[in-house]
């Protein structure tokens, strides 16, 4: 999948059919006698069934056949959604339950996405990178290889205005928990961002920054490496 620029994302969202996907549990006396709309996936037995489809299609169908159902329960998690969730089945990475990843996201081999992470359209995650619990990668956020994005960290997204630059995190970067990296910031290779930092300016390669706003503390040294080294065993599949 090619990297999406802001205008491509805007076009994708603007032209995509807006859908309200629902799952409908039904009970009746003779469900197999019903003819379901072609757009609906129907898994029915004689007296019970489950229907998958768009509410715009299923709502009138259920109303028309109200007398055929003894009970109906509707579940839905989105309304007029333009971007579905990413199909994870063939992604060569470890993705834990509860992560929310939208379509048009690139995830490199052996990456790790932890519970509660949210990754928006157009984001890219490099090989062997870990996105920790509750981290948020906004639209078009770019993260290189073998990074660690700490729990609760926010990499601000940029979809509009279309001319804005995304957050760019180079290879081998460690960002501590609950840090914020604002739009357009470039964090250089091997840098370390301390927990809770708010990064408003570019970070030079192999430097340590901390504070609000984040400021240069020192160059990465052996002591820093000993405290921030990543564990490759966590990235094995």
Swiss-Prot record:
It comes from the Bacteria. It is an enzyme of class 2 (transferase). One of its GO terms (molecular function) is tetrahydrodipicolinate N-acetyltransferase activity. PROSITE patterns: HEXAPEP_TRANSFERASES. Its EC number is 2.3.1.89. InterPro entries: DapH, DapH_N, Hexapep, Hexapep_transf_CS, Trans_hexapeptide_repeat, Trimer_LpxA-like_sf. HAMAP family: DapH. This is 2,3,4,5-tetrahydropyridine-2,6-dicarboxylate N-acetyltransferase. It comes from Limosilactobacillus fermentum (strain NBRC 3956 / LMG 18251).
